[in-house]
Amino acid sequence: MKKIAIDAMGGDYAPKAIVEGVNQAISDFSDIEVQLYGDQKKIEKYLTVTERVSIIHTEEKINSDDEPAKAVRRKKQSSMVLGAKAVKDGVAQAFISAGNTGALLAAGLFVVGRIKGVDRPGLMSTMPTLDGVGFDMLDLGANAENTASHLHQYAILGSFYAKNVRGIEVPRVGLLNNGTEETKGDSLHKEAYELLAAEPSINFIGNIEARDLMSSVADVVVTDGFTGNAVLKTMEGTAMSIMGSLKSSIKSGGVKAKLGALLLKDSLYQLKDSMDYSSAGGAVLFGLKAPIVKCHGSSDSKAVYSTLKQVRTMLETQVVDQLVDAFTDE
């Protein structure tokens, strides 16, 4: 049985979206057991399943505007800290939260701990592509600054995940840069390029540009945390703007526009789905001793369900255990 702890109070639509996602996952997956951390009365209001679900009551929670490190130190009975502690103590095997990102990073580092040999855990998520396959990208903001050595480790971590969790036999690893030529970039990217090109355990395909990300040019994209977070927010904003603009144009375009939209209904839904983060799962804080996964703050029940499915696969493939062995052997 795979035991997964969840912060039921984290996120914009908690606990409703969290619990509804759990209801669906429990119904679909007979090999998972979920521990919900949060306000029992509020959780029970939406909980429809009773088997393989337990509630650990606490009224304390970390808010979105709390200072991350201080909140983790001071709010030891919060739903987030208790969930992370459950993983540390072996009560749960993985932890999910849609709450304060910085606080989750702090809880992951200070409570769960990083894998020996990993310098800086990175935040990794599977990003959408036009063909629906997606690519894994890290770091998406766990670290504001990185060294070439960090990017080298991210390439190994990302390749490991793509192969073992997503089932890509030989993942293509690309370095996000301001040009595809080998000589492009600042000193950080030039040094990182040399390290990645010399790494025998990955299939490094060279530099890639941001404009090509959604064209499936790579299975794993490596970048520093500052750039990665900026790219993530840009992709999210662009997707929202495109869909919003299409909707406005159809509404204001008269009968012809509405008829055209009706004829293109299936194609428009396909476009919407290709840009939808909710089916990809959450962002993994990769490099820790256990799977710690961050749901988007605005996650609905579908996104929570997808994240539970993702974590179930991570536990099934024992990707973190394999990583521990790999880095210990180095």
Swiss-Prot record:
Asked if the Swiss-Prot or TrEMBL record annotates the protein with the keyword Lipid biosynthesis, the reply is yes
Chief subcellular site? cytoplasm
A single Gene Ontology CC term: cytoplasm
List localization entries.
Cytoplasm
**Bridged cysteine pairs (disulfide):** none
Q: Which domain of life is it from?
A: Bacteria
One of the protein's GO biological processes: fatty acid biosynthetic process
Protein keywords: Cytoplasm, Lipid biosynthesis, Lipid metabolism, Phospholipid biosynthesis, Phospholipid metabolism, Transferase
The record's catalysed reaction(s) read: a fatty acyl-[ACP] + phosphate = an acyl phosphate + holo-[ACP]
SUPFAM superfamilies membership: Isocitrate/Isopropylmalate dehydrogenase-like
Q: Broadest EC class?
A: transferase
**Role played:** Catalyzes the reversible formation of acyl-phosphate (acyl-PO(4)) from acyl-[acyl-carrier-protein] (acyl-ACP). This enzyme utilizes acyl-ACP as fatty acyl donor, but not acyl-CoA.
In the record, the note on similarity to other proteins reads: Belongs to the PlsX family.
Complex formation:
Homodimer. Probably interacts with PlsY.
Q: What is this protein called?
A: Phosphate acyltransferase
Native source organism of the sequence: Streptococcus agalactiae serotype V (strain ATCC BAA-611 / 2603 V/R)
